[in-house]
């Protein structure tokens, strides 16, 4: 996925799913399923319910995304 094709959005973690998947509610009200990016997994970044995150999505499938940043 090319970087310029991605859509970045802010959201909140609603629930944790198996295999490091999360249900995220975006600021516009949509709920998507997202997984952790490889660098976050490599550096053992913990994500809990209620955390504010930045996700990137492809314009081809707006129901799935990748968590790329966890806000403090």
Swiss-Prot record:
The keyword Cell membrane does not apply. It is found in: Cytoplasm. One of its GO terms (molecular function) is translation initiation factor activity. Keywords: Cytoplasm, Initiation factor, Protein biosynthesis, RNA-binding, rRNA-binding. Its main location: cytoplasm. Residues 2-72 form the S1-like domain. The keyword Transmembrane does not apply. Disulfide bonds: none annotated. One of its GO terms (cellular component) is cytosol. SMART domains: S1. NCBIfam families: infA (TIGR00008). Belongs to the IF-1 family. HAMAP family: IF_1. Component of the 30S ribosomal translation pre-initiation complex which assembles on the 30S ribosome in the order IF-2 and IF-3, IF-1 and N-formylmethionyl-tRNA(fMet); mRNA recruitment can occur at any time during PIC assembly. One of the essential components for the initiation of protein synthesis. Stabilizes the binding of IF-2 and IF-3 on the 30S subunit to which N-formylmethionyl-tRNA(fMet) subsequently binds. Helps modulate mRNA selection, yielding the 30S pre-initiation complex (PIC). Upon addition of the 50S ribosomal subunit IF-1, IF-2 and IF-3 are released leaving the mature 70S translation initiation complex. This is Translation initiation factor IF-1. It comes from Pasteurella multocida (strain Pm70).
């Amino acid at each position: 996925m090319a970087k310029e094709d991605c859509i970045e959005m802010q959201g909140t973690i609603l629930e944790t799913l198996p295999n490091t998947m999360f249900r995220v509610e975006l600021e516009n009200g949509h709920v998507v399923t997202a997984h952790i990016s490889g660098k976050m997994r490599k550096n053992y970044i913990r994500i809990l319910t209620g955390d504010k995150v930045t996700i990137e999505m492809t314009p081809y499938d707006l129901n799935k995304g990748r968590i790329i940043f966890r806000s403090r």
